[in-house]
Structure formats: structure tokens, C-alpha cells
Curated annotation (Swiss-Prot):
Keywords: Repressor, Stress response, Transcription, Transcription regulation. PANTHER family: HEAT-INDUCIBLE TRANSCRIPTION REPRESSOR HRCA. It comes from Ligilactobacillus salivarius (strain UCC118). Pfam families: HrcA. The keyword Flavoprotein does not apply. This is Heat-inducible transcription repressor HrcA. The gene is hrcA. Negative regulator of class I heat shock genes (grpE-dnaK-dnaJ and groELS operons). Prevents heat-shock induction of these operons.
Amino acid sequence: MLTERQLLILETIIRDYTDLGQPIGSKTLQEQLPIRVSSATIRNEMAVLEKQGFITKEHSSSGRIPSLKGYRYYVDNLVKPVKIDSKSVRSIQSLFGNEYRRVDEIIEMSAKILSDLTNYTAITLRPEASDLKLEGFRMVPLGNGQVMVILVASDGSVESQIYNLPNNIDGESLEAVIRLINDKLVGSSLSEVTSKLQELQPLLTKYIEKSDGFIDVFGGILDKAIKEQFYIGGRRNLLNFANGNNLEQIKSLYSLIDDESDKIGGLVDNTTNPHDHHGISVKIGDEMSDRLLLDYSLVSATYNVGSHGRGMIAILGPTNMPYSKMIGLVEVFQKELTKKLIDYYRNFDK
């Protein structure tokens, strides 16, 4: 159990290290603390905090910096979210001000806005609704024996993929396939469509001699529509906080942000974090799955748009980020994104 004075010292070290980015010594603390304490007493208290693992010493300085344990304790017990002023809220609202035709456009834009506001890497996850339905199906001729297979979901999202037509299929057969899919599958939930599609294979074979290829393409588009879709803004902002002397870390981070499998997006999920702070989750350093991110923290929040599902927003930045400000900002941004999505769905559902 930390004493009141030790709590003040820990909080001041974290705040000053966030502002200055340099180890904090006893003289600096003596000037910053709201209570009068001798430099010797401060050094003794710092020794206690260091022994308990809340702060650590850098070899090149006599000052101290927060440890991951120190940050964790601070976020769980000491942080007070900054209230975002009305001018900043209006600024966020104006950045969201465009009209959108697809929900994915809103989610993609939110990642860019959040990244621009923080100068960190932002990750946004599209709402995932268990009762999403297949709203429409089309095949658009592209020429050279190819068509674009297009699925429209009930939330307005659109997925598509190119399909190479068999040599012997004609326009009449193609129209028959479109009618069959619309008659038998449109209106079903996306989770049901997968199994129903297999049941349709004997009928599809009447019009497409080798229907396996079509079913594979259709199934691939369904998978994209069902799985969690995320967007990343400011990928390269990660490099701003890398250790400039550690060439291997920089190379590995480059690999991480350019990874086609989007490992960054995989950091965000819809599970509850044991360190939730009034609906805001904070993961610090080794609490994330990737060892490359030991010097980073993830601040995330879930948003809920009722029957249209739940999604998530997050920022990935340095462990010495200003947590009070970032938690307050993420909280406000989550509310504004939710409002924007509710407005979108209200218009779409009419």
C-alpha cells in the first residue's frame, strides 16, 4: 500500500516524464510537488517506489522513469480523465460532417480522424451484427469472360469479388442464377446463407456446369461480409516512438505496419478487458500479445449501435502518452461516432 506522499511522487514522475520525456530527479520533484518535502526525503521515497517496481532508473541518468507496473497502477488508481471542451467536441462533429453511403466509409474516416487528433495509430472496428441479412445480389459483366459478384448486406455494406465465367455459360443462364440467388437467399441472415448456398448447388449446376467455383467465390465474399472489418489510420505514427538506437526494432515495426495480415488490427477485439476504466480499456506494454509493442499502450472503447451491433475504436501510442487526455478524448470520440452511426442507420432503415 502506497502512502499519500508516495502516490503524489509517482503521479508527478509520470506527469513530468510524459511532458518532458526525460528521467525525473529529486530536485525537479521538489519544485513540482504540491507539498513541501526535502530533497533527501524525496530520494528515500523514490528508493521505496523503485524497490516496489513502480519506477526504474536509466543507466545514463540519476533520475527515474515510470515502469510498466507504475503506469498500470497510475491508470487503475490515479488517472482522472480530462473533460474535452465543447469547442473540441464541435471540431470532431465537423470532421464527421460528410454524408456517407456506406457504414464502412464512416468507420474508415473515424480511424483517420482519431489518428489526426492524437498523432498516434488509430484502429476502428466496424459494428458486427449477428442478425445482419443478405439484402441484395448482383452480377455485373466486366467483359473477357468475367463478372463482378456483388453482395449487399442489410446495414448497407457492400462486398464484391471477380468471378471467371465458365466458357459455356450464356447470358440467359447467368440471369437464371441471379434470379435463383435472389429468390432463395436474399432476406436470410448471413450466417444462414452459407448453409443454404450448399443446398442450392444441385440447382446451380443446371446453369453453371462447374458450380464449385461460383460457390467458392460467393462463400469468400460472405466471409468478408461476416468477419470483423477494421481500419487503421496513421500506421507510420508507430515509428515516431521507436527507440532510434535500436535498428532491429525499427525494422520489425516497419514489418508490423506493412504486414498484409494486419496484425495491428488484431490487437483490438470486442472482449472485456479487466482494466476497464469507466468503459475505456487500457493495455500497457506486455499486456499486449506482440513483444514489439512493449513500449506502447492501447487505449480502446466499445461502441454500441443497438440491433446493428457493436464495434470498437482504439489508439496505439507510447507508454508515456498523456493518459488523462487520451482516455477523455477516446470517451468523447466513442460517443460522437455512435451518434454518427445511429444517424446513418436511421436514414438507411427508412
